[in-house]
Amino acid sequence: MSLFVTFEGPEGSGKSTQARLLYESLYARRYPVILTREPGGTRIGDLIRRIVLDLQHTEMAPTTETLLFSAARAQLVSEVIRPYLEQGGIVLCDRYADSTYAYQGYGLGRDLAELRTITAAATGGLRPDITFYLDISAEDGLERKRRKHPGARLMGQRGVDQEWNRLDARELEYHQRVEAGYRALIAQDPERWRVLDARQSIEALAEQIAAIVEPYLASIPQLEAVPYS
């Protein structure tokens, strides 16, 4: 048996922190676990990440953006996710295909049927067992992220902090469409999603996530020793 867990949410939701904390907990308990992210997680994926998130690439067409994210995903599934799952391990992924539906589909207005076709090709139909959604409004999430990067501005303005990426910098209305898109996705597949209030403390969220994952661990054998990182 294996386990595939993904983390989704608007900007500033804290999903990356929670993915890392779950990874550290499972690793310490000697479970075979890896943590990866989208876009990225492979040499090719990291190169794509630099291109697709670069603030200077304001001329990028929506189709280009969609295909770049999907190319990074295809490489990640082929090189990292599927092989590790086939070995019976646990894969934690910071964003996955749902981000494409939310950000490029609902956010940019790309045709959802077309996105499903592209995603099926990129993933080979691989779906998560659990998807955690860290729930926070677009407004509150962006404010959180701006507090971390005080030089941040909206798209097209000067003086943007380099850690504030091209998608972060889009107008509030875009992020509101993304948030609404996530809610539509959750309604379509409620059994897979676990919705958690991202306004809680980091510790409270980590405890809830660990409790949800725990029953799935019964079928996954622990390693005899903690592997080298």
UniProtKB/Swiss-Prot annotation:
Tell me which InterPro entries the record gives: P-loop_NTPase, Thymidylate_kin-like_dom, Thymidylate_kin_CS, Thymidylate_kinase
Q: Select a single GO molecular function from the record's annotations and give it.
A: dTMP kinase activity
Q: Which PROSITE patterns match?
A: THYMIDYLATE_KINASE
Question: Does ATP-binding show up as a keyword for this record?
Answer: yes
Catalysed reaction per UniProt?
dTMP + ATP = dTDP + ADP
Listed under GO cellular component are: cytosol
Superkingdom is Bacteria
Q: Which Pfam families match?
A: Thymidylate_kin
Q: Which residues form a coiled coil?
A: none
UniProt: ATP binding residues: G9, P10, E11, G12, S13, G14, K15, S16
Q: What are the GO BP annotations of this UniProt entry? A: dTDP biosynthetic process; dTTP biosynthetic process; dUDP biosynthetic process
Alphabetically ordered keywords of this record: ATP-binding, Kinase, Nucleotide biosynthesis, Nucleotide-binding, Transferase
Residues making up the signal peptide according to the UniProt record: none
Q: Name the HAMAP family on file.
A: Thymidylate_kinase
Q: What PANTHER family does the annotation carry?
A: THYMIDYLATE KINASE (PTHR10344), UMP-CMP KINASE 2, MITOCHONDRIAL (PTHR10344:SF4)
Regarding protein family, the annotation reads:
Belongs to the thymidylate kinase family.
Entry function:
Phosphorylation of dTMP to form dTDP in both de novo and salvage pathways of dTTP synthesis.
Q: What is this protein called?
A: Thymidylate kinase
